[in-house]
Design a protein with these regions (language model features):
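Membrane-interface helix-loop junctions in multi-pass transport and translocation proteins
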Residues: 1, 13-46, 219, 229-263, ...
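Helix-loop junctions and terminal segments of transmembrane helices
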Residues: 57, 118-142, 211-214
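Interhelical loop/hinge segments that connect adjacent transmembrane helices in multipass membrane
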Residues: 26, 30-37, 48-92, 143-146, ...
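Membrane-interface junctions at transmembrane-helix termini in multi-pass inner-membrane proteins
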Residues: 1-8, 197-227
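Alpha-helical transmembrane segments of polytopic membrane transporters and translocases
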Residues: 36, 42-43, 80, 95-97, ...
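Helix-terminus/linker motif at the lipid-water interface of multi-pass membrane proteins
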Residues: 21-26, 86-120, 138, 177-182
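Interfacial/gating helices of multi-pass transporter permease domains
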Residues: 30-34, 69-77, 81, 99-119, ...
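Interfacial segments at transmembrane-helix termini and the short loops linking adjacent helices
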Residues: 105-107, 145-146, 172-200, 248
């Protein structure tokens, strides 16, 4: 996890340097920006690969080490993660399209500004929950279920603290807008509450999805992510068109769709840990 963070830092640093070169030396264009992004990504990936394999020779791929016995199980697991990620991309990218189509493009700015404030909490959560994926995997192989249970409890406590921060953010949101964009013209209390609930559901779910990913248990996530994707669009359209929620209906539609996993996951996780601890 530390190496991945180091790699991401190098990528961001290289992008800043290349953007400065583009601003002061080259004529700015979308094509130029795309080329810089491609070059930066390519160079950093080459450097990261050489750096990693030079320090860890046993990580170098070899045909001799391929185990075709594991091919089917690895392909099944990889396909599950792929479908989960595709579902997430569809789920998280359709909201603005729905707003533009149902309410008009001028309403997108309300949603985008509000979401950018609250989505910061998922970034904060990512700092401590990201490394837990590999840690859960290691502890699962060691059969250290006490550590896993204690860690998930700590993660949930941190999530509760983030909920408190979200409540504070709701109460001062108009001041945040004034500081950020210079006015509070895009203040919409109903939308603020809806997005706060939507982000809260995501924070709660991330605790359990990270654990289940670490245990390579993707069955529940695959089913619920597909169900959420299929439910989200028609539900959001219904809430916008046939209720008085307006733009907030988009966020509520996403929150309700994600709640399928958020409700089932704690019980499923408890069942798995209880079963494994008695083996």
């Amino acid at each position: 996890a530390s190496f991945v963070n180091f790699r991401n830092m190098l990528f961001n640093l290289s992008m800043i340097i290349m953007l400065l070169i583009m601003i002061f030396i080259m004529e700015g264009s979308l094509l130029g920006l795309s080329i810089l992004f491609l070059l930066s990504n390519t160079f950093i990936n080459i450097f990261s690969t050489l750096f990693l394999y030079k320090r860890n020779l046993h990580f170098i791929p070899s045909i001799k080490l391929i185990s075709f016995k594991l091919f089917k199980s690895n392909l099944k697991l990889g396909l599950s993660f792929f479908l989960i990620n595709i579902s997430a991309i569809i789920m998280f990218s359709t909201d603005t399209l729905l707003i533009s189509h149902l309410l008009g493009p001028e309403h997108v700015i309300y949603y985008a500004l509000t979401l950018k404030v609250f989505i910061a909490f998922t970034m904060v959560q990512g700092f401590y929950i990201g490394p837990l994926w590999s840690a859960y995997s290691a502890k699962y192989l060691e059969k250290d279920f006490d550590w896993i249970q204690k860690t998930i409890k700590k993660s949930l406590l941190i999530t509760l603290f983030l909920y408190l921060c979200i409540l504070i953010t709701i109460s001062v949101f108009n001041h945040i807008l004034n500081i950020w964009i210079g006015n509070s013209d895009y203040y919409n209390f109903d939308l603020i509450v809806a997005i706060a609930i939507y982000v809260s559901v995501r924070l709660w779910s991330s605790n359990f999805s990270t654990l289940l990913n670490g245990l390579s248990l993707t069955h529940l996530q695959l089913k619920t992510s597909i169900a959420a994707t299929l439910l989200n669009i028609p539900l959001s359209i219904y809430l916008v068109k046939y209720t008085s929620l307006g733009i907030a209906g988009i966020a509520y539609g996403s929150a309700i769709s994600l709640s399928i996993f958020a409700v089932i996951a704690p019980f499923y996780t408890y069942k798995i840990l209880k079963r494994e601890s008695y083996k």
